[in-house]
Amino acid sequence: MLAKLEMILEGEEIDYRNSSNLQGVLMERIDTEYAEILHEQRLNPYSQYLIKNENQYIWCIQTLNEEAYEQMIQKMISQDFSEFQIKNKKSAIRITEKKLNIQKKANLMEQFYEEPGKKYYNIEFMTPTSFKRNGQYQIFPDLSLIYRSLMKKYSASTEELDMYCLLYTSPSPRD
């Protein structure tokens, strides 16, 4: 199950520099045991980011599997979570609206495989983005890093196929 929760935030101390602090808010809401599991994983089955759309700040949380959905989005969409405070900040941040979009993986795969692909795609990064290669952060990603990241995210969303492992552990065609 693929899910995206969008929360419209209202408060004086919201800006893009707080997006890493929102990670802390998220970790405080989930079960301690699940938070520990996430810290041990090399690839998280979720992403979160803060964007500004016109005059609204929108905090987005996306999950790639059922467990992440239950542990994260279910807790964040709860009626009792209507405001929070970022550590070391004075004022509360209110959540004025929540929107949940759920898509079954089968529907996504059907769309991906049955609709004709384009020859060219434009990629627009909505937040600052970096990729890790050989333990170093790359702030200017190349196509191989983008593909690698997409394959890892896909593999994290399914138990049926590990795309990344297949690609990087298979013998080369010349062998």
Residue ranges and their predicted role:
Residues 1-66, 70-72:
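N-terminal ordered "arm"
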Residues 4-8, 58, 85, 94, ...:
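Ser/Thr- (and often Asn-) enriched beta-sheet segments in non-cytosolic proteins
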Residues 21-34, 146-162:
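Active-site helix/loop of acyl-thioester processing domains in fatty-acid/polyketide metabolism
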Residues 61-116:
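Acidic, low-complexity central loop/insert segments
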Residues 79, 124-130, 153, 157:
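Mid-sequence acidic-hydrophobic segments that form the walls
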Residues 102-148:
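Surface-exposed beta-loop interaction hotspot
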Residues 138, 158-167:
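Short acidic alpha-helical/loop segments enriched in Asp/Glu that coordinate divalent cations
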Residues 168-175:
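Conserved small/polar residues in nucleotide/adenosyl-binding loops
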